[in-house]
Swiss-Prot record:
SUPFAM superfamilies according to UniProt: Glutathione synthetase ATP-binding domain-like, PreATP-grasp domain
Pathway connected to this protein: Cell wall biogenesis; peptidoglycan biosynthesis
Function: Cell wall formation.
Family to which the UniProt record says this protein belongs: Belongs to the D-alanine--D-alanine ligase family.
Record organism: Methylocella silvestris (strain DSM 15510 / CIP 108128 / LMG 27833 / NCIMB 13906 / BL2)
GO biological process terms, semicolon-separated: cell wall organization; peptidoglycan biosynthetic process; regulation of cell shape
Positions with a binding annotation for Mg(2+) 2: 268, 270
Protein name, as recorded: D-alanine--D-alanine ligase
Length: 307
């Protein structure tokens, strides 16, 4: 009898639409691999649904709050349902950008200087000399991220809006010029390094990430060999330092601009990276000869409650 897999998707976070796409792609691939699949759009009665369903494993295709921060992982452990990706602690750490940076810094991973501050304080005066970046502490997919440019005289007033939905604390972080790089870790091995560019030459924001034709992926990234290897090594160190399991993706900035310093810093570790067939991790896996079906099969076979 084929293994029964519950694909958890949708959810209650700002990244709901991205998660629905990840979940649908994973469910389709698992069915093609011979698994019996039930898709669950996660809401506040998910524990009851899972208890009634009793799947053999759960593939976590959730992104953002409640799905990527240790909450759903705790529910699955309480119900003794093996699940994919990282466990409770690693998920919570990776989702909280300031806490993750503390752990990475202690492990010797280079990160950009930053400070955690209330959003209203960050809107009163420049916290640091521009350019800098303002990020919500616990969101992904670039939701709520603000770039404060070098010529910007006033701090970002978007932070004071009544409809701000990303929490009252923000991370203000020094802007690092140069290229955006990313590296996937699958199991305990770092795979290919991709350079990501917004198709319009601008910032790699939500539209660039998820709209058709919004970004250009260069795989393998055109880097000197020692830089390429350094990215892979740091991705693996970051994955291990946070205690990640299964699949993760670490994002970097590399300053090789004409006046640059050659600085390479980790921006964040994604413990629940996008999982559509054209997302970065499946693309990197395919470059290594791992099909999307093989990837999701491995993820389910790797699922456990000891993460």
């Amino acid at each position: 009898m084929s293994k029964h897999v519950a694909v958890l998707m949708g959810g209650l976070s700002a990244e709901r639409e991205v998660s629905l796409r990840s979940g649908a792609a994973c469910a389709k691939a698992l069915e093609a691999e011979g698994f019996r699949v039930t898709t669950l759009d996660v809401d506040r009665d998910i524990a009851q649904k899972l208890a009634a369903l009793r799947p053999d494993a759960a593939l976590n295709a959730l992104h953002g709050r409640y799905g990527e921060d240790g909450v759903i992982q705790g529910v699955l452990e309480m119900l003794a349902i093996p699940y994919t990706h990282s466990g409770v602690l690693a998920s919570a750490l990776a989702m909280q950008k300031d806490r993750a940076k503390d752990v990475l810094r202690a492990a010797g991973v280079p990160v950009a200087e930053g400070v955690t501050i209330g959003r209203f304080e960050a809107a009163k005066a420049h916290v640091m000399t521009p350019p800098y970046v303002v990020k919500p502490l616990g969101e992904g997919s670039s939701f709520g991220v603000i770039i404060v440019r070098a010529d910007q005289t006033h701090p970002p007033q978007e932070l004071t809006r009544d409809d701000w939905a990303y929490g009252d604390l923000v991370l203000v972080e020094r802007f690092v010029a140069g290229r955006e790089l990313t590296c996937a870790v699958i199991g305990d091995k770092a795979y290919g390094v991709t350079e990501i560019r917004a198709a319009d030459g601008g910032w790699y924001d939500y539209d660039a990430k998820y709209k058709a034709g919004g970004s250009i992926h260069i795989l393998p990234a055109n880097l000197k060999e020692f830089v390429y290897q350094n990215v892979q090594e740091l991705a693996l160190v970051a994955h291990r330092a946070l205690g990640c399991r299964g699949v993760s993706r670490t994002d970097f900035r590399y300053d090789d601009t004409p006046q640059g310093t050659g600085e390479l810093v980790v921006l964040e570790v994604n413990s629940q990276p996008g999982m559509t067939e054209t997302s970065l991790v499946p693309e990197i896996a395919a470059y290594a000869g791992i099909s999307f079906g093989e990837l999701v099969r491995w993820m389910v076979e790797d699922a456990s409650c000891d993460r």
